[in-house]
A protein has these predicted regions:
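A short, well-structured alpha-helix characteristic of acyl/acetyltransferase catalytic modules
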Residues: 1-39, 43
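Acetyl-CoA-dependent GNAT
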Residues: 35-85, 91-93, 144
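Beta-rich extracellular carbohydrate-active architectures
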Residues: 112, 138-139
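Alpha-helical elements of Rossmann-like donor-binding domains used by nucleotide-donor carbohydrate transfer enzymes
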Residues: 13-17, 44, 48, 102, ...
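Conserved catalytic-core motifs of GNAT/GCN5-like acyltransferases
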Residues: 120-124, 139-152
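Amphipathic alpha-helical recognition patches that constitute DNA-binding helices
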Residues: 14, 85, 89, 102-103, ...
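Conserved beta-strand-loop-alpha-helix junction that forms the acyl-donor binding cleft
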Residues: 91, 110, 120-131
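Conserved acetyl-CoA-binding loop-helix of GNAT-fold acetyltransferases
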Residues: 96-110, 130-131, 135
């Protein structure tokens, strides 16, 4: 069973490790793959996402009963979608154990608790996570050759 963990700045080593891992970030290959997250960027990122979310952002780590961080969940207001966009990333070594489904359920519950009524996700058309989102109640809103927009009413 996973729990949500509000990371401290010192915990951002885990986010850096996930974003630098090619297997974890394979879903992002359409947008460049791995993402640099150097320590000098942590303070600004933390201020924006954690310290001052302004009702527009939510971010948590997924934490296993063992105490290991296994992924992240987040949502943020995306003007191009006209609503809140979901984010679920499970660190590759922890995939295949139901963490993505559990993380998505935790994200939807947190968003609903925070007054969000609809969540969207734009997913690369070749991303196998589409099946996960559809199995959890998301529906296809629109599609292009490159991506699919999914939506769930909370």
């Amino acid at each position: 069973m996973l729990s949500l963990y509000l990371p401290e700045k010192k915990d951002l080593w885990f986010r850096r490790a996930m974003l630098a891992d090619a297997q974890t970030m394979a879903y992002n290959r359409a947008w460049g793959g791995v993402i640099a997250f150097p320590e000098e960027d942590w303070a600004d990122w933390y201020a924006y996402w954690i310290a001052c979310p302004e009702g527009k952002r939510f971010y948590r780590y997924l934490k296993a009963e063992s105490g290991d961080f296994v992924g992240e969940i987040a949502y943020h207001f995306d003007a191009s979608l006209g609503g809140f966009a979901a984010d679920v990333i499970v660190f590759a070594p922890y995939r295949g154990r139901g963490s993505g489904a559990e993380g998505l359920e935790l994200l939807c519950a947190a968003a609903k608790e925070n007054g969000v009524s609809v969540l969207y996700d734009d997913i690369a058309a070749d991303n196998p996570a589409i099946a996960l989102f559809l199995s959890r109640g998301f529906v296809e809103e629109s599609r292009t050759a490159d991506k699919i927009i999914l939506r769930i009413n909370l």
